[in-house]
């Protein structure tokens, strides 16, 4: 089921986000890129703030701007597979859905080298049988900013501040300038409250979770 809003994980209020002295780890994830307008600016901001993120890229965008994806990986962020064509995998046969993911995986391997490119299916939807056929983990989210819908920095910030807590995986899209504005403001603010921004793989490792192929992770 596609999650929305604060998701089904533990919801943190603004009051609960006060610094307790212990680091709080969050994974910001960005779908549907790369975008030549937005992704480089986002990467500049992440570098300045010392924050890491995970980018679930779409193959049909990767072929247009491969240098941006190479930069994402070179700067220590995690690159994931968001399919090649961003089709609703439920509208495809299982063979077609898996072939679309495999096409993007092959592209990423050619561009970045061999590695485990974790999967986020478009719209977060995939059958159990399709997931079980994968050799990598799947990643969904516990906080949905709905940035693609609102395109409003204030509303995006509100969701992040109300809903994000230790161990959350936040869904965003690096195709909107308002998202970049909101994210960089949020990172700077939350870092002052003890938040550390890491990749999904790092988040699971920090929380002592060993990722398994075919399993879906929404938070840590």
What are these regions (language model features)?
Residues 41, 63, 87-215:
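Catalytic domains of cell-wall/extracellular-matrix polysaccharide-remodeling enzymes
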Residues 219-220:
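Short, solvent-exposed mixed-charge patches
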Residues 3-5:
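C-terminal motif of bacterial Sec signal peptides marking the signal peptidase cleavage site
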Residues 7-110, 114-116, 189, 196, ...:
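Active-site beta->alpha N-cap acidic-glycine motif
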């Amino acid at each position: 089921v596609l999650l929305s809003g604060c998701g089904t994980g533990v919801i943190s209020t603004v009051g609960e986000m006060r610094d307790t002295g212990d680091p709080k780890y969050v994974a910001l994830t960005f779908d549907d890129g790369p975008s030549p307008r937005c992704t480089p600016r986002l990467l500049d901001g992440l570098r300045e703030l010392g924050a890491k993120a995970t980018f679930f890229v779409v193959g049909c965008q990767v072929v247009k701007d491969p240098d941006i994806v190479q930069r994402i990986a070179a700067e220590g962020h995690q690159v994931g597979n968001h399919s090649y064509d961003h089709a609703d995998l439920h509208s495809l046969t299982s063979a077609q859905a898996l072939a679309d993911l495999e096409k993007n995986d092959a592209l990423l391997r050619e561009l970045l080298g061999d590695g485990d490119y974790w999967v986020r299916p478009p719209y977060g939807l995939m059958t159990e049988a399709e997931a079980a056929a994968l050799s990598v983990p799947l990643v969904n989210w516990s906080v949905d900013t709905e940035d693609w819908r609102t395109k409003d920095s204030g509303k995006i910030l509100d969701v992040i501040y109300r809903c994000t807590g230790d161990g959350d995986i936040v869904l965003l899209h690096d195709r909107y300038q308002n998202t970049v504005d909101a994210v960089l403001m949020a990172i700077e603010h939350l870092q002052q409250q003890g938040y550390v921004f890491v990749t999904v793989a790092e988040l699971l490792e920090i929380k002592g979770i060993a990722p398994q192929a075919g399993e879906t992770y929404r938070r840590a």
